[in-house]
Amino acid sequence: MPMASWTLPYRVEAVDRDPGFYWQEIEDGHNNDGSADFFGQFINFDSEIPSSMADHHGHNPGMPTLADGLMLDHPSESTASASSGVSTTEDEFDLFSCSSQVDATVPSQPGSSAAPGASHDVDPRSLALADSSGLMVEKHSMVPRVSMSDPELPRVDGISLQSSPGRRVPVSQPSSPTPPNTMTRKPNKFVEALSSTIRKASKLRKPRKPIAMDRPGSPTMDNPPRALRLQHHEYNGNDVFPPSPTTCGPDSTNFVHGFCDDPFDEIPQQHPNNMRFFKTNGIHTPAESPGIKTEPGMYQPEMAGQAVWPHQQHPHPHPHPHHPQAHTHPHPHPHPHPHQQAVAGHPQHAVPVVGPAPETWPGHEYMAQNAHQSGWWDLNLLNQNGEYVVVDPQQQKNANLNLAMHAQHAELPYEYQVHDPNSAGLMIHMPQPRNDSTPAHDLALNAQTYLPPPPPIPPTTERHRPPRAPSSGARHLSCSPIRKTRQPSIPPTPTTVHSRHSSNGSVASARSASGRGMVPGTPTAMRKQRRSRDSSGGSVGDIGFVNFTPSDGGLLMTGVAPSGSSKTKARREREAMERRRRLSEAAMKAVQAAGGDVDKLMEQGFAF
């Protein structure tokens, strides 16, 4: 009866234990050597059981030796599985030591199938063997059974709490070469919590592994690199091109030249807006480039139905990774080809091409995705092979300009690749060309894409209405005709029209010049008169807009607003007039005091 109560917890727990439950993600899940065993530090591997586990309870010295047949009945079943990878080449006592100590931690694990009564806190000391003496009669009530009654539970808890490490140390020291068994049996709660945590983690990770295994290799690389490596056998028939060193597996047939936009692939498979570049060739010049292009998977909506280069006109409706032989250009995104759909609404879809298809171009990546977007290099220009590419002019007229240049920059993913030296670009935040295009193309393209010119001027015969204010000339410069084609502007300076400001200013300036002792004919006086006269020349005839020229500097500087110098000049003139008035009044008073006739003097022309 006591033997049954001993062995039953081992049997139940051992059968239910998963030998490789520690890390489900390890490829070699059946690692049976103790080096990968996490609980190795909590297990006593010594081969002398009676002395190493002798005195764990000082109160039961009369515990008889449990029969060797207890463990020799099923040594491999109860120990190889219960100790989770403990080597079975140890002797029988060592096996029993391992299993008896592991069993203290096993009942608390949540995945076990033991009865709930046996999964309470059971200290390893309550399961230890005594000194080869007899088995106590009450000992079997403290040993965990499959079913344990509630009154016995406090006794088990009491045993786990009243153990003293002082008795255990001197007996286990001489025969135990591994000191962790004296240190790690004390925190039983810690061992149980740790084992249950690992058990839960392994149960949570367990369903994730088959998902990564069963997932088909998608060109978007949603599966991790290891999952790609596990599926090597699925694509052996399709590996036309060798896998690139920068990619993770034979899915790299979709990435022919070893290009991987993002190893972690968080790029959404969204269809961005219509994105085109400004060009300086006019409004009917298409805007597409082999050097910098949209991602191959990001087809614009209006591209659907456009027949592209002749090498793409084969009739298989494909998500691309299953036909890598037919496509030498990578398609990192799964999509049914838009150019395989109906060509409704685009009658001018054919692109006449003279010479080989552009899959012979460097990089094998260029596709004229939109016939309306055949770029500036197609306008009677040579491609990289030195052959002309002709585009229907009707397609050029249908090309429209998308002013949202920032959308192109925002929706293109970054490149995590060392750029080719031939890709001559600024490399600021614009994704660089993926193929080995010529530097001349990239230089011209970067000049046009980084600094887009103003919108082209549509040809028209009527003149633009000029801006009403002189300061708005800079804003309307791109829309107004070139300055050289205008009629020579008539500056408002050489005018003879005098207003009241002009007359008053002239008299005042002449008076001030004479009052200061300056002859009116001197250059200073003439400059003052001309300056005061210029202030009135704002309205010349019926001109609604005055086009100022460099000769209008005097008018612009003096006639706009009174500056500090003009205010000072006016103040000095007022002061001089006040002095002259006071002087004349003083002279008149002096004449009157002398008895002279002031009126007679003024009649004779004497000016005070």
Curated annotation (Swiss-Prot):
Report residue spans for region: Disordered.
54-88, 102-125, 146-186, 202-226, 309-352, 447-544, 556-576
Q: Which domain of life is it from?
A: Eukaryota
State which residue ranges cross the membrane: none
UniProt lists compositionally biased (Basic residues) regions at: 313-338
What ranges does the record list as Low complexity composition bias? 77-88, 107-119, 163-175, 339-350, 502-517
Q: Cross-referenced InterPro entries, in alphabetical order? A: WetA
Keywords (A to Z) from UniProt: Activator, Conidiation, Sporulation, Transcription, Transcription regulation
- Asked whether the keyword Transcription regulation is assigned, the reply is yes
Q: What happens when the gene is disrupted?
A: Results in abnormal production of conidiophores and conidia, including longer conidia with fewer septa, conidia sensitivity to acute stresses such as oxidative stress and heat stress, and vigorous generation of single-celled conidia through autophagy-dependent microcycle conidiation. Reduces the survival rate of aged conidia.
UniProt record, GO biological process: conidium formation; sporulation resulting in formation of a cellular spore
Instruction: Copy out the induction comment.
Output: Expression is positively regulated by flbD.
Q: Which family does it belong to?
A: Belongs to the wetA family.
Q: What does this protein do?
A: AbaA and wetA are pivotal regulators of conidiophore development and conidium maturation. They act individually and together to regulate their own expression and that of numerous other sporulation-specific genes. Functions to maintain conidial dormancy by suppressing microcycle conidiation.
Name of the featured protein: Developmental regulatory protein wetA
Taxonomic lineage: Eukaryota, Fungi, Dikarya, Ascomycota, Pezizomycotina
